[in-house]
Amino acid sequence: MASFFQQSLATGWSFKDAEDNSAEAWMPVAQVPSVVHQDLIANNKLQDPYVGFRELDARWVNEKSWTYRTVFQKPAVPAGSSVILAFDGLDTFAKVKLNGNVILESNNMFLAHRIDVTKALGADGDHVLEIDFDCAMLRARELRAKDPQHKWVGFNGDPARMGVRKAQYHWGWDWGPVLMTAGIWRDVRLEVYTARVADLWTETDLAVDHHAAQISAFAQVEGAISSSKVNFILSLHGQEVARAVAEPQDQVAKVAFDVQQPSLWWPNGYGDPTLYEISATLDQDGATVHQISKKIGIRTAEVVQRPDKHGKSFFFRINGVDIFCGGSCWIPADNLLPSISAERYRKWIELMVHGRQVMIRVWGGGCYEDDSFYQACDELGVMVWQDFMFGCGNYPTWPEMLESVEKEAIYNVRRLRHHPSIVVYVGNNEDYQVQEQQGLTYNFEDKDPQNWLKSDFPARYIYEKILPEVVQRYSPSTFYHPGSPWGDGKITSDPTVGDMHQWNVWHGTQEKYQIFDTLGGRFNSEFGMEAFPHMSTIEYFVENEKDKYPQSHVLDFHNKADGHERRIATYLVENLRTATDLETYIYLTQVVQAETMMFGYRGWRRQWGDERHCGGALLWQLNDCWPTISWAIVDYFLRPKPAFYAVARVLNPIAVGVRREHHDWSVTHAQPPKKSKFELWVASNLQKETRGMVELKFLSVDTGREIRERIVREDVIIVPNGTTDIIVDGVIDHQEYAEPHVLAARLWVDGKIVARDVDWPQPFKYLDLSGRGLEVKTVSTSDDQQTLLISAQKPVKCLVFEERDGVRVSDSAMDIVPGDEQTVTITGLKADAPPLKYKYLGQ
C-alpha cells in the first residue's frame, strides 16, 4: 500500500501581464506564495509602494490581469494512487489550466481548492500549469453594474468590493493604501495517495470541577477500505497520554479519551496555555499510509449574557473564570499578505503578551489569518475574536454569492476549529451600522429568512442564518455573535447590550478623551485615537528632508483617515502646547493617544468590578499594514508607540487608579472650578483575595512638594477579580489648595510596589512643565541588558524612551514624581551602543 506523498510547487514559476504576448514578457518568480506586487518589485518593474507617493505609481497594477505559469515533472504515481493539485488560496478571479485545459475557475480568495489531476497527468514528462488572474477591480465594477437594484452602500473603498470575496482592505481603507493584489497567495502542491486523513478534530467535555475531561477525536478518511484503521494518540509535552484505534464508519473514525487531572489552556496571566497534541495515523493492509497531527487545548469558553442592573451583560468566561478582555483589534499586518512570515506573526503576539493583552479581534475587512497567527495565539495564551470577512457594507446575496460564502465559512471554520485561542465567531464588522445609517430594512422580530433576502438588507441572511448554522455544525461549542457591534437587534450604539464601537472620541461628536470611560458599553470592541509613528518610521517613507514637517503633503498622503487634520489639531490644541517641529509634533500626538487609551481602559476596567458593567475593551488598532499615521499603538515595523505602555500599565494584574473630576474647560470660559471630587480604587484580576497598602500623595506641579497631608490606607483587602473602592467621595478645595498638583497613588503588596497611577490637572497646556529635575542613571549593565534608575524633583509627564529595532524597554510613557524612583530595564542594547534618547512633556 503506497503512502501519502506531496510535492511542493513553490518554485519554478514565471509571470507576465496577461495582455502582453511577447516572448520577453515572462519574468521569474522567486517563489510562491506571492502576489504580483512582490514579483514586480523583485523584477525592478515596481518600486516599494510604501515609500513617498509611490502608491500612486503602483495604481496601474490594480487594473491589470496577470498570468502565472510553471512547468513541472509528473511525480511517481504508484498503482491505484490519485494525484491531487491542491491550492490553499488563489487571489482572486483565477482560471487554472493544466496542459491548456481548464481544470478550475475560482472567484473566492478565502477558499482552498483540490483538483484530481490523475488523468490529466497521464503522460510522463513536462506538464504546464498556468493560472490567469483576472483584474478584481474591473470584475467588481462589472458585477455591480449587473445588479443596479441592490443598494451598494458602505464605508471605505469602492462599494463594488462587496460583490467580490477578496480582502476588502485591498480597495483601500481609512488606514491603508489601494493595492489590488493578485496571485498564488497561499501554498500550492501536488499530493499523491491512495488514502489519507482528510481532517482531524476534537470535541471536549470538561468536568465542572476540572478534574476530568473527555476528548472525542474524529478523523475523516478519504479512500477508506475494509482494512482501514486509524490510530489516535493524545500526548502532552511529547509524552503519550492515551491511545486508541478505530475503524472508519461512513468515512469517519471516532474515539474517546478520558483524561484525568487535565492541564487546561488559559489566557496569558491566568495560567499556562497548555497544548495537547492529537495525532491520527491511517493504516491499511497493515501499512501506514498517512498521518496528521494538531495541537489542541482543553478549556471551556462562553460569553455570559444575563440581565442585570445595567441591562444585559456581555463578557467572556474561560474555564469558569470571568476574564476582563483587555486587548486590541487586528488588521492584516501587510498589504502584501504572503510577505508576512511566521516569525513576524509571532513577534506581534509576543508583543501583545508583553503588553498584558489577552484578546485580539481579527477584523472582518482583512482575511482569515495564516495558521501561524493562530498557533502563536494558542501557544502564548491570547484569545481570538474572529470576525467573518464582511466589513462596512451592504453585501449582495446572489445565489452564487451565498453558495460561495457558505463554502468559505465551512472551509475556514473546519480549518480553524481546533485552535483553543478562538473563543467567538462574529458575523461581520459594522454592517449593521451601515444598515442603520442608510435606513435599510431590519425588523428583528421578523424571523423568516426568506423575507430577509427580499429586503434591501439581504445580507442579514448571511449573518443570522448561513454563518450561525455553519458554526453550530462544525464548531458547536464556539459562541456565535451576528455582528460587531450588535446587541439583540437593538440600535448598535445601545450601551446596555451586546458590544459597542465607541467612536465619539475622534469621530462622531469628538468628545474629550478625559470622559472616555463614561461613553462605553457592555463590551467596547472598537475605540481609538490617532498618533504619528516614531521618527524612524517616518524617515522610511518620507524621502526628502524638506517634507519633514507636520503638515507636509507626503505625511497627509500617508494618513488615510477622513478629516485627520482637524481631528488631530482639535485634540492637540485642546490639551497641549502645540509645536511645529516634526519630532515634537510626533511626540505630542503620541501623548494624546496614550492619555486617551489610559482614560478609556482605566475606567472600563474599574467598571468590570461593578457587576461586569464593562466586559472588555479592544482598542482600534494594534497594528498597521504599511508605514503610516493611524490609530495603531504599534507601527508597521513593530515599534510600540507610548500608548502601548500606557495600556500595559492599566492592564497590570493589580492596578491602582486615581481620578479627579475634570471640568470641561472649553465650554465654561476656562473658568477653574472651586472644588473637585476625586476617587481612588484598586482593580485586580487575581483569583484570590489580596492585602495591600495604598498611598495617595498631593504633589505641586510647580515645586514638587506635598501640598497637603498624604492619605495612607494600610491592610486594604483587595477583592479578587474585581474592583476595590478606597475613596469614592474625596474632595479637593481649589481655594485652599490653589496651586496645580498631581494626585500620585502607589500600591504595595507584600512590601513591594506593584502599581502606580498619577492624575494630572487638565489640560496640560495650562501647566508650566519646565525644569523638572529629571535624572536617568544607568545602575547596572550586562552584555545586552541595562537597568536605569529614574528620579525627578518635580512631577514629570510621559517620559518616552526611543524605540530601536531589536531593543525592548520594560516600560515607557511613564509619569515620574518626587520621592518615587522607578527602574526601567532595557534588553537587547549592546554595552557599547549609544544610550536611548528620551523625551518628556515640557522638555
Curated annotation (Swiss-Prot):
Keywords: Carbohydrate metabolism, Glycoprotein, Glycosidase, Hydrolase, Polysaccharide degradation. One of its GO terms (molecular function) is beta-mannosidase activity. Pathway: Glycan metabolism; N-glycan degradation. This is Beta-mannosidase B. It comes from the Eukaryota. Glycans are attached at N721. Coiled coil: none annotated. In contrast to clade A beta-mannosidases, which are likely secreted, clade B proteins appear to be intracellular. Pfam families: Glyco_hydro_2, Glyco_hydro_2_N2, Mannosidase_ig. It catalyses: Hydrolysis of terminal, non-reducing beta-D-mannose residues in beta-D-mannosides.
